Amino acid sequence: AELSGMAESAPAASKAQAEAKEQDGVLLTLDIPSYLPVMTYCDNQALREEMYRAYSTRASDQGPNAGKWDNSPVRAEILALRHELAQLLGFENYADKSLATKMAENPQQVLDFLTDLAKRARPQGEQELAQLRAFAKAEFGVDELQPWDIAYYSEKQKQHLYSISDEQLRPYFPENKAVNGLFEVVKRIYGITAKGRTDIDVWHPDVRFFELYDEKNELRGSFYLDLYARENKRGGAWMDDCVGQMRKADGSLQKPVAYLTCNFNRPVSGKPALFTHDAVITLFHEFGHGLPHMLTRIQTAGVAGTSGVPGDAGELTS
């Protein structure tokens, strides 16, 4: 009853998490694969509120664990050290230092861009929120939407308008089909073939290693693929460089290696992981970041691959 409204896969994953810690019942965490299904599908408003408050106040001086893992002093120290670093390098502040290698010319230009974007986007956001409030009132008798209600009633509205749910799409995106589909797209567009290797050391059994070969069977680059959420792993999804392409002093060419990291739901009870449509988009997006790094022809480390792309242009490639 506590988890009514949720698809079978979410409670099964939560039960598996509890069993892994030798606990009874189910274990809900603030990792996105655990948190998001509760906020989107769980009929229990009190549980949604509890999860929302815990998530939005994590590592702070607020909320149910106020001060226990408070990162505020760490943030203050980071800001102070960044300011000191910027001044040592001759910049007025860290924002000026950061923009020295980016397309934007100065902090005011960035603020003007963001202010203009907010001005243009806000009317649409307000319109959609008004429509959601009207829907929740008409269909469910909800007088006032709380922050922990937004995702839940947005999903109800989507099902009402379009008769479709993310949960209905997941069986079409098992992990192997999604990953192999990504590799097939890359092969068709770039003539690049991904080949797995099992003789490379990895930091967790979930992690896999692949090499990319072009049509001449030349090794162009490699990457570690770390797809699943797990305890003590940083949240989110990202690509990062392990090593960049570089012509070394002895004349040999160091080939690029990337990290492609996500936090998707893991396989449960021997069944393959089923990805949401958003997860598939994320997978393609992060691989899109990896391609410029791994396929570069530049042999000077400081400008090879993503090192040669301004930071505020990085999202354009993926």
Task: Tell me the role of every PLM-derived stretch.
Residues L219, T296-S318:
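Acidic/histidine-rich catalytic neighborhood
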Residues G67, N71, P171, E175, ...:
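Alpha-helix N-cap/helix-initiation motif
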Residues G191-R197, P292, I298-A304:
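Acidic/polar loop patches that form or flank catalytic/metal-binding clefts of enzymes
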Residues Y41-Q62:
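Short, charge-rich amphipathic alpha-helices with coiled-coil/heptad character
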Residues E22-V26, I32, C42, S60-N65, ...:
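Substrate/cofactor-recognition hotspot
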Residues S56, Y228, N265-V268, G288, ...:
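Hydrophobic alpha-helix feature that most strongly marks membrane-spanning transmembrane helices
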Residues H83-A86, G90, V186, R266, ...:
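Active-site recognition of the HExxH zinc-binding catalytic motif
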Residues A1-L30, A76, L81, Q87-R266, ...:
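Active-site-proximal, well-structured secondary-structure segments within enzyme catalytic domains
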